[in-house]
């Protein structure tokens, strides 16, 4: 899953990966996505937040980079920001909510690491 050669954070931030990947202390980590069930659920959840964005005071984004620590960047399936949060290209303040849609290939330890990163950053809801 992770590459063996260390990649500088500046290189990660200057490149576009298709699909986007996480950056963990110099290593790129691929994410499990692209299957019909995963994409369908991601779209439905994003749609719920998008339709209610005005009433709830939120903005939802699919696959947005979040800097969870100095050398750690995660790309949740859906990030929900408060309307008042900064609108920077990379999120550096704790979002209101990070959603990870699980795929059959996802493993408990890897998910616990992702969720732990969000909680340590200060995300209240995962």
Which ranges hold each PLM region?
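Gly/Pro/Ser/Thr-rich low-complexity, intrinsically disordered segments predominantly at protein N-termini
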Residues: 1-125
């Amino acid at each position: 899953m992770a590459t063996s050669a260390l990649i500088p954070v500046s290189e990660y931030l200057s490149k576009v990966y298709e699909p986007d990947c996480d950056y963990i202390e110099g290593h790129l980590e691929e994410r499990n996505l692209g299957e019909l069930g995963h994409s369908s659920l991601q779209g439905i959840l994003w749609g719920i937040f998008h339709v209610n964005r005005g009433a709830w005071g939120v903005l939802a984004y699919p696959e947005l980079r979040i800097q969870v620590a100095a050398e750690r960047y995660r790309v949740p399936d859906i990030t929900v920001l408060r309307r008042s949060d900064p609108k920077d290209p990379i999120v550096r303040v704790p979002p209101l909510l990070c959603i990870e849609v699980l795929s059959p290939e996802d493993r408990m330890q890897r998910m616990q690491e992702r969720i732990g990163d969000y909680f340590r950053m200060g995300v209240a809801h995962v």
